[in-house]
Amino acid sequence: MKATFIHTTRYFLFAILAMSLTACGFHLRGQVDLPSSLKTLTLTSESGSDEFDRALRIALVKAGVVIFEESNANENTFNLKVNKITSSDIDLAYDSSNDVTQVQRRLSSYYFIRQADGKSLYGSRQISTSRVFENQDSSASTALSYNTSQMKAMYTDLAAQLVSDLNYAPL
């Protein structure tokens, strides 16, 4: 009798905890619930980076968005337009021979949602990310390989930030 009371109490407390997490808007990390009007989009990217465009398409598809070509879109299909990505560097550290050893790189861009007739509905909104690049005084091939992998991660972060921000679009 006593054992079943303890088990019942534990299950009851666990159920209360689960319901309270759900009630407060708890979502799994990376899960995005986009408005239904944004589930079908056309994409116009002037980012200047194929790596970002690829990361953005992957992030949109993971969020449940179907991306149409503009020729297949109708008047109810919105267009996601991404402007050119800008990059800025700040030197953070130098070695004894005055060579840069650490750089903070910041990537930013603006995007907006347009109707089929070109009128903007949401935006322009800024997205940005920054990261510290170390080992800039290494050999050229090592630094290039490191920087390439870091840039790829930054583009993925930027795309994830854009998709996450779309979650709050009042459409």
Please report, for each region that a protein language model flagged, where it lies by residue:
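A structural "domain/chain start" motif
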Residues: 2-7, 20-65, 169-171
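Sec-dependent signal peptide recognition
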Residues: 7-15
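Short secondary-structure boundary/capping segments
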Residues: 32-33, 72, 119
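Soluble non-cytosolic domains of exported or imported proteins
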Residues: 46-54, 100-104, 141-157
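Short acidic low-complexity segments
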Residues: 65-76
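Surface-exposed short loop/turn segments
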Residues: 75-126, 133-148
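C-terminal/domain-edge helix-coil "capping" segments
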Residues: 115-117, 138-171
